[in-house]
From Swiss-Prot:
Family from the record: Belongs to the histidine acid phosphatase family.
InterPro entries: Acid_Pase_AS (IPR033379), His_Pase_clade-2 (IPR000560), His_PPase_superfam (IPR029033), Histidine_acid_phosphatase (IPR050645)
Catalytic residues of the enzyme: 33, 313
Keywords: Disulfide bond, Hydrolase
Naturally occurring in which organism (per UniProt): Caenorhabditis elegans
Keyword Cell division included in the entry's annotation: no
Listed GO MF terms: acid phosphatase activity; phosphatase activity
Entry EC no(s): 3.1.3.2
Disulfide bond annotation, renumbered to this chain: 379-385
Protein name in UniProt: Putative acid phosphatase 10
Sections of the chain in a coiled coil: none
Catalytic activity: a phosphate monoester + H2O = an alcohol + phosphate
Entry keyword annotation includes Disulfide bond: yes
Taxonomic superkingdom: Eukaryota
Amino acid sequence: MFLSLFCVIIVAVGCSSKDGNVKLEFVQAMWRHGERSALADLYPIYEKDWVFGGGGLGELTGRGMGEMNNLGRLIRERYVRKFNFLEPKYASKEVYFRSTNLNRTIISAMSLLYGLFPPSLYDIPNVDYPFTPLKWLPGLAFVPVHVDGSDQCAASQNCPCPRYDFLQQQMLTLPEVQQAFQQVILLNRQIAPLYNVTTGVDTFYVYPDTWKCQRAYFNKTMYDKLPWYNEQLYSKAEITYAPIKGFLEGSFSQPAVTSNGLDVAFEIQQVRSGVMINEIVSRASEKLNCVERGQNCTSYLNKLKFYGYSIHDNNVYAVLVALGIPHISATEDGWPSYAAAIFFEFYRNSQTNKRLFKVLYRQDASSQITDVTSQVPMCQGVSMCPLSTFQHLADVLKPIPDINTVCNITS
């Protein structure tokens, strides 16, 4: 019998049940950065107009900082106040935060941490921060964010991967993809002339994402300068491009097998999410091994409780696709919203040593963190899922012998 009473009665950091003592041991989370400026110039808005959050293209806005701060507060509410799992102030051995090497993800992590560990009476002057009246905000203690190096590009999909380029060409032979791309090309041919674009019309892809950013701050300017622009056209662009975003991460509504037998959906998932899924499962397994060894564990994971990763919409979406729940992103344009987040909670039954996990999702900047474990197909409707099922998924998606070798296979 599974843990039907889970989280009805919370005892400290775990729950009691008929199956024994089930305790939360480890949490891994990943989130999309907060709202950003556009990535490209597009009339009538140019880089000089993007003054928010330091200014420039692709930068986190002040609103985006607030979105991430709110996510940090939600994390604090769950893991500090509700579960008594994390210390109320920063403890270096308990938490580890990582980011891709872009300003918007780095500052998103910093903003989140300001919500997770805000200035408080828990922070001690001259211990957690310098006591210099009028020169330092009382209680403000910094938390490090570790930025990915060039050797960590695979998990965040930033490594060059000729195999992925090959798979994108192969997917263009699929009827589902051809139909969706035809709609994109027709829309591009409608929009490009309005910007006086005469070459590369079929690949004029810049406008949907740019409109999304522009309308947040310059909606009146757009209506004044672009007499043909309206909300219906914006929505059409978002909806038309949404299937393409799904294909790029291995999400298809029909069997995605080419005429020569290549399973494009599986192959794309392997190179796009395989490394990330395996990192998550491997880290969780090592942590739970460490818990079972107790004092004999010398791993850095010995005291670590929370591992967070500040990344991008396509990274989060790729994991949702791998889990079989891409639909929960629930956005018009397909990919997860700003400040969307996935949480993996890993539990251990101290009597049976059974390992379990839960999946939680935060849909957007105005949403709460919601348990979606029962929606994950491999969990078959249960509220707590055996870790072995996650391990099986990792084994299936693992690039063999390694991602570098797989990425260099172009046939």
